[in-house]
Amino acid sequence: MKNKQFAVIGIGRFGESLVKELTRLGYEVMAIDIDEEKINDTVDIATHAVQADSMDEDTLKALGIRNFDVVIVAIGNNIQSNILTTIMLKELGVNKVVAKAQNALHGKVLEKIGADLVIYPERDMAIKLARSLVSNNFLEQINLSPTHSVMEFFTPVTLADKSLVETGLRKKMGVTVLAIRRNDDVIVAPGPEERLRKGDVIVALGSNDDLEYITNLD
């Protein structure tokens, strides 16, 4: 079992999926929800599953919430509870609080009250789905900021058989190719003379607009 400890508050579809994945990856995870039925559903998944009111300061203290490395506020059906829980966690000295936002305004409030990271699962999933539907090349994306990402995509036909310097990705667009996956091999930090081949998977860092433009090339 790995050392990092997580607590997930709010066991809806997103929260439960998060608990499952973190547990699968070998981390200790405490699942917290006020709904006994939801907690019963995670008893066999989480390291610990506790029925508790996340807006009760004494309860959070008793759970040792400040000792967790990361606490994720995944409450989605009650914005007030989501915000108040986030405030309380920061006041209790939790090292890193990740909070789920329903919309942009909710996200701004969470940022103002001190959430270390604000996430938009529904929005991000919709964006990812839309990009996969309109592009034949798009595979995966990791958002680093609102404007920049690391994206994984198949080499567009127009870039195949060209060296990286010939593609102009870095010079013209400021896009950095971090790695190329070719069959079972991974070329990390490829040189400017490395030639792209049809079927190569490119892992690149750049602005969202530039990356989206590249993935939509024929």
Residue spans for each PLM region:
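Cytosolic regulatory regions of ion transport systems
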Residues: 1-218
